[in-house]
């Protein structure tokens, strides 16, 4: 009877591991997991377009981070705070959102194509790309000049 229970328990563990239930989400080395996604704070300043390109080249499905909830915003803020070195250029960090038309209206979707379900603007300006501001502990979104080099966070 005891051996039968051990075999049954072993099969249950294998089944749960294969189905992904109860297993940790597996991210590439150097990436952090949160809610079935992987994130990487990149401490190398780039323009918005170059940062987006860098993220797409890191992994299949990679893009600048899209923030869908306050919980995810808090996770990203902590990740950035812990992984971006303090310099004069750490006032802002790119996220995957920018204005797509001449009237400076923001796109209705993130750079990864997902819908905007959560917003946390600090102010509206005429610049086209969005980032997180250090002064708000990387929790508020601010409009920035797309060509300026800032650090950024990728998501897959």
UniProtKB/Swiss-Prot annotation:
Span of the signal peptide: 1-23
Location in or out of the cell: Secreted
First-listed, main subcellular location of the protein, grouped into a coarse class: secreted
UniProt-listed InterPro entries: C-type_lectin-like, C-type_lectin-like/link_sf, C-type_lectin/snaclec_domain, C-type_lectin_CS, CTDL_fold
Domain C-type lectin: 34-155
Family annotation (SUPFAM superfamilies): C-type lectin-like (SSF56436)
Gene Ontology CC terms, in alphabetical order: extracellular region
Keyword Secreted: yes
Disulfide bonds: 27-38, 55-154, 129-146
Reported tissue expression: Expressed by the venom gland.
The entry's keywords: Disulfide bond, Hemostasis impairing toxin, Secreted, Signal, Toxin
GO molecular-function term, one example from the UniProt record: toxin activity
Family annotation (PANTHER family): MANNOSE, PHOSPHOLIPASE, LECTIN RECEPTOR RELATED
Subunit structure: Heterodimer; disulfide-linked.
Family listed: Belongs to the snaclec family.
Role of this protein: Interferes with one step of hemostasis (modulation of platelet aggregation, or coagulation cascade, for example).
Note: Shows greater sequence similarity to the alpha than beta subunits compared to other heterodimer snaclecs.
Name of the protein this chain belongs to: Snaclec A10
Organism for this UniProt entry: Macrovipera lebetinus (Levantine viper)
